[in-house]
Amino acid sequence: MNNIRILQGTYKIRGKDVDLSGMVFPLVEEFKVGAKGGYVTVDGKAVAGFPDRNIKIACNGAADYEDASGAQITKREETDEETIDRLRERFDMLEDMTRATKKGDVRAMIVSGPPGVGKSFGVEKVLGKHDLIAQLGDRPAKYEVVKGAMSAIGLYCKLYKFADKDNVIVFDDCDSVFADELCLNILKAALDSKKTRRIHWNTDSFKLRNEGVPDSFEFKGSAIFITNLKFDKSKGKIREHLMALESRCHYVDLTIDTEREKMLRIKQIVSDGMLSEYKFAEELHQEIIDFIDINKARLRELSLRTVLKVADLAKAFPMKWEAMAENTVMKR
């Protein structure tokens, strides 16, 4: 595949036409004219900041680009604004997908991202709003968040409890179900693409008899898995398990992989009002963010949770919160 240098051309990034003049891309297909005008097709995944697929660069003709076989592919860095917009879009999409899961349009979803960036908050916010009517009507909740370890029989019973349509089970950092083969087989049956999803427990169990759970039932609910695991980077036997589950789920990677992206996510959430309940002066808001940013390499965890810890200290110890934070949230 030859490289080409764009002499004159644009591509929409976050809804804005970005001038790509001078940038080098691998050529996929020569100039063509489509319904929206002329374009040349290049490999976007080769250049950072572009979609992981072929993209169409708008141009007027083949004269708007030239052969650049000996040139290096352009290394383009996202601006802070572009990164914040990308992350905001991802989290908005997470909320949209959660609504679709609640309605039953999406059977299952895996949400992958580092700890403390707001994965669980976005999911629970949407489900909590939908569940308000059930609470007001004194009806059983239609969703539950499961955390920690879970056995196969515990999983079977939980799925039975939320087997009805419009019910959702959220597995939040409950990664033990991914490693256990029996749990995985139960989940594969529950999330199968067939019209009828029937789950069976074929061994005698006192627990099932005691709780009135049948040895088979039809599962019509949905599931959301919130995890810190990167499925595509997993290795060994667990990779086979994760791939089997991923094939039955929509996979949402929040694309927060670097310290810079985590820090920009923190700045975005704070600017959106995360600390408003503390009623701090705007100057103190900025001091807290600056403290996190300056010391990010030494923090025990760069996350929204750490921001809240520092805010708690600023409220409790207005005159010495920085000294307190240095001793509680930073590595020694």
Predicted stretch roles:
Residues G70-G104:
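N-terminal pre-Walker A segment at the start of P-loop NTPase domains
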Residues M263, V270-M330:
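Conserved AAA+ ATPase small/helical "lid" subdomain
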Residues A179-F219, I226-N228:
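Conserved catalytic/switch belt of AAA+ P-loop NTPases
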